[in-house]
């Protein structure tokens, strides 16, 4: 006499394997890629360089700083969303929900992804994909919420494009300081 749970049919095993493969595939699809912007990127001529570069630092410091970004592919462009350590001025502001995504760590409680500083880097030689040296908490936050982050970033990009087509992006508070002002051609605006 068989006891419950001892014998498993081939059909049950096949179904279990199929479920595991689907879960593995969906995890691979959600794989977060971290990109590091290389120095040559900052040597380009930008229309609005202050919004791409750290305006509080000199040119040499800007070119040597390591920018950890979350990579996003959308509409034949590669977007890099910078992980910034201090978004303290943003959380209380009403635009925070549309412009940033909090990714705090114990050492950096105000860290997050800043959609205002998204850059377009379609040339793979200007960035490298590598494992980011960030806290496990930050890594898990981005991995677990990648689809939400992706959708928020796409909403921001689409909103910017809509404003730019009307030549209003410099007047709308959400886009006034956007790094995307430097990538109008890549976005199909010009």
Name these PLM-found stretches.
Residues 5-64:
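GIY-YIG nuclease catalytic motif and its immediate N-terminal context
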Residues 10-29, 102-190:
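C-terminal terminal-subdomain/extension
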Residues 36-38, 81, 119-121:
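Residues in well-ordered beta-strands of folded domains
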Residues 41-42, 87, 125:
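Residue-level detector of flexible, active-site-proximal loop/helix-junction positions
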Residues 58-62, 73-111:
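Compact nucleic-acid interaction/catalytic patches
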Residues 67-70:
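Short beta-strand-centered aromatic/proline hotspots
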């Amino acid at each position: 006499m068989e006891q419950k749970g001892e014998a498993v049919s081939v059909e049950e095993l096949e179904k279990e394997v199929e479920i595991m493969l689907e879960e593995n595939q969906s995890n691979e699809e959600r794989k977060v890629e971290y990109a590091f912007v290389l120095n040559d990127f900052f040597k380009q001529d930008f229309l609005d360089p202050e919004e791409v570069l750290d305006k509080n630092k000199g040119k040499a410091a800007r070119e040597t700083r390591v920018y950890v970004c979350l990579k996003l592919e959308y509409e034949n462009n590669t977007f890099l969303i910078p992980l910034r350590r201090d978004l303290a001025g943003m959380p209380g502001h009403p635009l925070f929900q549309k412009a940033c995504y909090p990714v705090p760590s114990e050492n950096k409680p105000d860290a997050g992804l800043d959609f205002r500083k998204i850059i377009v880097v379609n040339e793979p030689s200007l960035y490298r994909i590598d494992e980011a040296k960030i806290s496990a908490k930050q890594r898990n936050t981005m991995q677990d919420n990648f689809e939400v982050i992706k959708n928020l970033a796409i909403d921001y990009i689409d909103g910017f494009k809509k404003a730019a087509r009307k030549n209003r992006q410099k007047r709308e508070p959400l886009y006034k300081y956007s790094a995307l002002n430097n990538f109008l051609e890549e976005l199909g605006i010009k």
